[in-house]
């Protein structure tokens, strides 16, 4: 693995850990981190799956120098893959009765609190 890729991987894990703590402090229960449904499914990795009450959030974490660039980094193809990952998770662990699911984005930028963008997109579910 090239050095820059390793650094990016390390930064991504750090950003996810920061988001997990932020979510916990705001009353969320973490159900999974880096959830993968398996090879050959066409599903991507969901960075964080969290629950608060009857709401389950599938959260994509982006660490960028500028918050605006973080949203641009989530392509339509990536959204579809994350949605498939969420569907695979819900196939194994169904929503609670009258439960809801949504897709959120958490943005980590230097010297700023994490930004939690709720209901960032809707596909399928």
UniProtKB/Swiss-Prot annotation:
Family matches, as InterPro entries: Restrct_endonuc-II-like, tRNA_endonuc-like_dom_sf, UPF0102_YraN-like
GO molecular function: nucleic acid binding
Pfam families: UPF0102
Domain of life: Bacteria
Stored SUPFAM superfamilies: Restriction endonuclease-like (SSF52980)
NCBIfam families: PRK12497.1-5 (NF009151)
UniProt xrefs under HAMAP family: UPF0102
Family stated for the protein in its record: Belongs to the UPF0102 family.
Name under which the protein is recorded: UPF0102 protein Rru_A3692
